[in-house]
């Protein structure tokens, strides 16, 4: 009987008013595997309460369908363009934290990554643009060149998972 190590299952978020979600599996010495990536677009014409409820429900559905998780991580929010943009992100952040809490999960400070660290994980450069991040994620996961993330938020969430892998594995 072989003793096979179970892969680490990572749930990663790119949190905004239109958040990205990714589920990635990783086993030491193996290539990370994309299990699921999605994002949602909230309607800015809706009330904040409606938008945050939708974000929370989507996160809860994802946690229910793809859990259990060994790690939950997110991109660290460093400030919005203005007060309203910051409020939107913090509201989405709280909505996701509510969903996580319902299933017994939290996000440790050590599992939050700066935008530069996320970009570097995907591309090798902390100054990459969105298209470079998407291409880097495809390359790192060996996804076909024609694999399309339907929103930047999806590839960004995958890049967050890659940042966690890079910071928690031996090279």
Annotated model-derived regions:
Residues 1-171:
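Phosphate- and other anionic-substrate recognition elements at nucleic-acid/protein interfaces
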């Amino acid at each position: 009987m072989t003793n096979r190590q179970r892969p680490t299952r990572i749930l990663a978020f790119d949190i905004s008013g239109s958040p990205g979600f990714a589920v990635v599996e990783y086993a030491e010495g193996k290539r990370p595997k994309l299990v699921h990536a999605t994002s949602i677009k909230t309607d800015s014409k809706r009330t904040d309460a409606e938008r945050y409820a939708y974000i929370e429900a989507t996160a809860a559905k994802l946690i229910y369908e793809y859990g259990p998780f060994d790690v939950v991580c997110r991109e660290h929010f460093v400030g919005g363009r203005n007060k309203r943009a910051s409020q939107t992100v913090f509201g989405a952040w709280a909505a996701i934290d509510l969903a996580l809490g319902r299933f017994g999960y939290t996000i440790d400070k050590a599992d939050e990554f700066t935008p530069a660290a996320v970009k570097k994980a995907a591309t090798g450069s902390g100054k990459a643009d969105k298209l470079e991040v998407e291409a880097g994620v495809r390359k790192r996961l060996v996804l076909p060149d024609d694999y399309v993330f339907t929103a930047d938020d999806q590839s960004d969430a995958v890049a967050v998972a890659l940042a966690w892998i890079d910071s928690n594995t031996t090279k």
